[in-house]
């Protein structure tokens, strides 16, 4: 089952592209009409020979098409894909193997994380802390219950292979001087029922090779196994013993047996006889409490969905800082049985405050994801088993474990190579930073679009030739699309994004702060560029090729320095911070500067340029740099005001 829902980024970019496309096409048509009208009404084109008329009309058409090329963000999808691809490669170094490209950004929009307990919050290094025996006829039977009713192994170095819980039992047996391999060789397996999250127990029918005695061995969740046991073999204090173990964050396991003559498991008769109860410790990962706190401070709700008991899950939640005894109550946790029995309406009223879902089945996890999505949440969910595949598919972001099954990995969007919750928090930071970098790219592009459109409109009505040629526009477009995308995509993630709340699903990718910046910088560009054209028209009557070369170079270097404004947008630090380590960003700057120099010095008639003197280059570079210096001064002032407001609080 797949949700088939578009990602938040995809919806926003589609809407933005359509809006910009409509405006760009409308303005290009307007420019074409103005140019044709001026040619016929002002320049007397109607009386010119038809070959000249055709040439002028085609030239006007080419200018209009070039305007569409500049205004319409046809390179936006490619640029975003480039950003996502670069992020995928870099996230791999932080133990996040991105399997589906869109997941890079979607993690930044996540509002709820439904996480497993074992291995993700804990170390998955289980160790049997205590085994309480109950009326065993001999110790051999307990050893067989551990060794034969298991699919795990110990390697040559004594490390467990297979299920971690079963591996912990084998390690305990070895510490008790038991030989699990010899015990296995001493019995014949007649039938086996492997563990499943639905049954919550495992059963193996064995026959001893020496005595031909047959036993059905069972191990699993205490409440399931005890329900099948003879009450006479179950001591009254066992519930208190189990609860005491669980309150210490121990996983509990019950072992039972029954002598039988059956050849198949279903033929064996109940009730069983309780053999022992095991308490298994699985310590919390050291880095998890800080990661959970970081996610919670970022406005992300964390919910534990586990097959363990409520007491065990609650203690783990307490250790990682998710559960507060002074604030949280039974309303903040549910068992799988309660969850299954509740209606969707009841759950919708409760899941917002739910923190723990214990004794949960995979279908419970999928249902929880579906209900959270109905409430408008963007949900990330973890899973490592084959049965987790539906929930991984249905979630906005499915997170499989590096130690999980291939089915779970194929169904997921990201694989956590180290299985740790810390990597989930890191993925959120990457996703938010990626979204911010995409905003910076759009900010850069729309600022240039705004200035270019206004300059083109003004140039089309002025008594002068177009300030930029078609070839110059194409070079500007390369800067706006490919090079700027590379520069913004190369920026490293920033921890500051984890101090913000998740963005709203319906929020426009163009924020109010971006609109203010676009309007401010774009207006400055327009004033500078139109001021140059107006001054030349006033002083010389018609701009010379040298003056238009200066105009073209000024336009490009305004973009050059505006890259710093885009880099510093919402950065929380100076735009120059860390620039020495941003090799891609520096390379892009060098390519723009070198490319512009080559075009001006060698472009000739193709680019309508003439070589400039070093003094002219110095004036252009120096004066256009004021756009970056001014932007940095404004951002520094805002940061100081923000810090003052925080101190006042």
What are these regions (language model features)?
Residues 480, 525-526, 549-564:
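Generic alpha-helical transmembrane segments
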Residues 1-502, 509-510, 523, 538, ...:
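Conserved cytosolic headpiece of P-type ATPases
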Residues 34, 528, 558-561, 595:
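Membrane-embedded alpha-helical transmembrane segments of multi-pass integral membrane proteins
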Residues 544-548:
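Transmembrane alpha-helix entry/boundary detector in multi-pass membrane proteins
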């Amino acid at each position: 089952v797949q949700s088939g829902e578009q990602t938040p980024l995809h919806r926003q970019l589609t809407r933005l592209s359509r809006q910009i496309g409509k405006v760009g096409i409308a303005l290009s048509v307007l420019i074409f009409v103005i140019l044709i009208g001026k040619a016929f009404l002002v320049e007397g084109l109607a009386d010119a020979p038809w070959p000249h008329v055709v040439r002028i009309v085609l030239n006007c058409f080419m200018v209009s098409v070039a305007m569409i090329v500049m205004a319409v963000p046809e390179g936006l999808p490619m640029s975003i894909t480039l950003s996502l691809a670069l992020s995928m490669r870099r996230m791999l170094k932080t133990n996040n193997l991105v399997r589906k490209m869109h997941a890079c950004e979607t993690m930044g929009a996540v509002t709820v994380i439904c996480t497993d307990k074992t291995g993700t919050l804990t170390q998955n290094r289980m160790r049997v802390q205590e085994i309480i025996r109950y009326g065993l006829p001999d110790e051999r039977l307990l050893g067989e219950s551990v060794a034969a009713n298991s699919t795990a192994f110990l390697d040559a170095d004594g490390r467990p292979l297979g299920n971690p819980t079963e591996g912990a039992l084998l390690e305990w047996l070895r510490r008790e001087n038991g030989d699990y391999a010899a015990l296995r060789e001493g019995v014949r397996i007649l039938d086996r029922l492997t563990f499943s999250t639905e049954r919550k127990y495992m059963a193996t029918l064995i026959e001893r090779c020496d005595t031909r005695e047959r036993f059905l061995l069972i191990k699993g969740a205490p409440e399931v196994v005890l329900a099948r046991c003879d009450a006479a073999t179950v001591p009254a204090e066992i519930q208190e013993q189990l609860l005491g173990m669980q309150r210490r964050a121990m996983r509990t396991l019950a072992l039972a047996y029954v002598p039988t003559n059956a050849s198949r498991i279903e033929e064996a008769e109940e009730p069983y006889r309780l053999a022992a109860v095991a308490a298994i410790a699985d310590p919390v990962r050291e880095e998890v409490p800080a990661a959970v706190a970081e996610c919670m401070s970022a406005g992300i709700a964390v919910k534990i969905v586990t097959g363990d008991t409520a007491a065990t899950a609650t203690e783990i939640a307490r250790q990682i800082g998710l559960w507060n005894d002074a604030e949280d109550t039974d309303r903040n946790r549910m068992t799988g049985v309660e969850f299954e029995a509740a209606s969707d309406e009841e759950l919708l009223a409760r899941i917002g405050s739910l923190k723990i879902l214990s004794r949960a089945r995979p279908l419970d996890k999928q249902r929880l994801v579906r209900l959270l999505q109905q409430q408008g949440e963007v949900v990330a969910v973890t899973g490592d088993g084959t049965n987790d595949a539906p929930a991984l598919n249905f979630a906005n972001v499915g997170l499989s474990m590096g130690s999980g099954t291939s089915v779970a990995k194929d169904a997921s969007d990201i694989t956590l190579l180290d299985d740790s919750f810390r990597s989930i928090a890191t993925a959120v930071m990457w996703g938010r930073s990626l979204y911010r970098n995409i905003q910076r790219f759009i900010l850069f592009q729309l600022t240039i679009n705004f200035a270019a459109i206004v300059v083109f409109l003004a140039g089309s009505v002025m008594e002068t030739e177009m300030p930029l040629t078609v070839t110059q526009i194409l070079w500007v477009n390369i800067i706006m699309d490919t090079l700027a995308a590379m520069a913004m995509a190369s920026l490293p993630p920033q921890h500051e994004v984890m101090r913000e709340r998740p963005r709203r699903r319906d929020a426009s990718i163009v924020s109010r702060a971006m609109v203010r910046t676009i309007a401010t910088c774009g207006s400055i560009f327009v004033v500078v560029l139109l001021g140059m054209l107006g001054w030349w028209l006033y002083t010389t009557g018609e701009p010379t090729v040298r003056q238009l070369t200066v105009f073209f170079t000024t336009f490009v270097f305004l973009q050059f320095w505006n890259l710093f404004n885009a880099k510093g947008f919402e950065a929380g630090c100076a735009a120059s911070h860390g620039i020495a380590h941003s090799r891609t960003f520096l390379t892009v700057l060098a390519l723009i500067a070198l490319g512009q120099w080559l075009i001006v010095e060698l472009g000739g008639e193709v680019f309508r340029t003439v070589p400039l003197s070093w003094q002219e280059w110095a004036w252009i570079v120096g004066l256009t740099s004021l756009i970056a210096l001014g932007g940095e001064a404004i951002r520094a002032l805002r940061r100081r005001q923000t810090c003052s407001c925080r101190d006042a609080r």
